[in-house]
């Protein structure tokens, strides 16, 4: 693969590309092995250029957002990893907000507030990117991205730019079509309603205070680990199983909110994954409830 990597680097000298880059520098858990190549494009043409070069050199492509709801395995990721955080422009026009994929959801909700637009208050404390939020239909406190998104501009596997409507994105709970078709979200368009700025700010502050009171924001974590199973809430299930505070290596079921796993220091991705599996097995054994990860898990599996 070394010759392929060298050829790729030769073709992309004008783009910020790092080799053997530890992804623990980027993930919210502070865990994860290296990427063979990590690219930080600043524009759509650069993204398209990267895809062309990767395909020419038969390099696998992985796109990640803000890495807030992500676990990268300790052996890292083969080929090219693209992080879009440098593509973070947000534009407010009337009641429409258009945000590039690398823009933060928090920053996008703040931009909406600055235009006295209501609808994204629920997202005021979600640490992910717009692209990641579209990818997984991120949500909190009764709201989801699909509630306000009208369309998304995507880059297909054939390197073609397309616009998909809300319906075409096939949203459901923590799911979108992007998870199935391998496309890259480039930007999202949100249609909002005019509101009263102080009321919007009050709601955002209220939800942020609730988040701070209930979530373990003082430690690195990957956010909500499991999807909510039908008829149950994850945190109480884990508490009832006696797993709150349970620790494997440096990864611990949060003592503040059992639906979170925090890095108490020196955790590895393997610690996280071992603890996740243990929780799943225990909950199934005790309650016959299957917990499905909400967190995205990627990277090379150990032999």
Curated annotation (Swiss-Prot):
Keywords: Cell cycle, Cell division, Cell shape, Cell wall biogenesis/degradation, Cytoplasm, FAD, Flavoprotein, NADP, Oxidoreductase, Peptidoglycan synthesis. Pfam families: FAD_binding_4, MurB_C. Residues 30-195 form the FAD-binding PCMH-type domain. One of its GO terms (biological process) is cell wall organization. One of its GO terms (cellular component) is cytosol. It is found in: Cytoplasm. GO terms for molecular function: FAD binding; UDP-N-acetylmuramate dehydrogenase activity. Its main location: cytoplasm. Pathway: Cell wall biogenesis; peptidoglycan biosynthesis. Belongs to the MurB family. PANTHER family: UDP-N-ACETYLENOLPYRUVOYLGLUCOSAMINE REDUCTASE. Cell wall formation. This is UDP-N-acetylenolpyruvoylglucosamine reductase. It comes from Latilactobacillus sakei subsp. sakei (strain 23K).
């Amino acid at each position: 693969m070394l010759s392929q990597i060298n050829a790729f680097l030769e073709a992309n000298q004008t783009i910020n590309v790092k080799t053997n880059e530890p992804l623990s520098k980027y993930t919210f858990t502070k865990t994860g092995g290296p990427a063979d190549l990590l690219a930080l494009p600043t524009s759509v043409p650069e993204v398209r250029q990267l895809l062309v070069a990767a395909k020419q050199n038969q390099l696998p492509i992985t796109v990640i957002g803000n890495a807030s709801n992500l676990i990268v395995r300790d052996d890292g990721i083969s080929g090219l990893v693209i992080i879009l955080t440098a593509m973070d422009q947000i534009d407010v026009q009337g009641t429409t907000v258009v945000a590039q994929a690398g823009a933060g959801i928090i920053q996008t909700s703040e931009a909406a507030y600055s235009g006295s637009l209501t609808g994204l208050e629920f997202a005021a404390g979600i640490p992910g990117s717009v692209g990641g939020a579209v990818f997984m239909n991120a949500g909190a406190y009764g709201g989801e991205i699909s509630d306000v998104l009208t369309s998304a501009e995507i880059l297909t596997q054939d390197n073609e730019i397309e616009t998909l409507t809300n319906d075409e994105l096939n949203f459901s709970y923590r799911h979108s079509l992007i998870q199935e078709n391998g496309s890259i979200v480039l930007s999202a368009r949100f249609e909002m309603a005019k509101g009263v700025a102080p009321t919007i700010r009050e709601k955002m502050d209220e939800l942020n205070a609730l988040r701070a009171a209930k979530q373990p924001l003082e430690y690195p974590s990957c956010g909500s680990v499991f999807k909510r199973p039908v008829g149950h809430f994850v945190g109480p299930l884990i508490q009832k199983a006696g797993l709150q505070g349970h620790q494997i290596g440096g990864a611990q079921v949060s003592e503040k909110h059992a639906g979170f796993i925090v890095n108490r220091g020196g955790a590895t991705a393997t610690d996280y994954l071992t603890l996740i599996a243990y929780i799943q097995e225990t909950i199934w054994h005790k309650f016959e409830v299957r917990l499905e990860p909400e967190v995205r898990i990627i990277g090379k599996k150990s032999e």
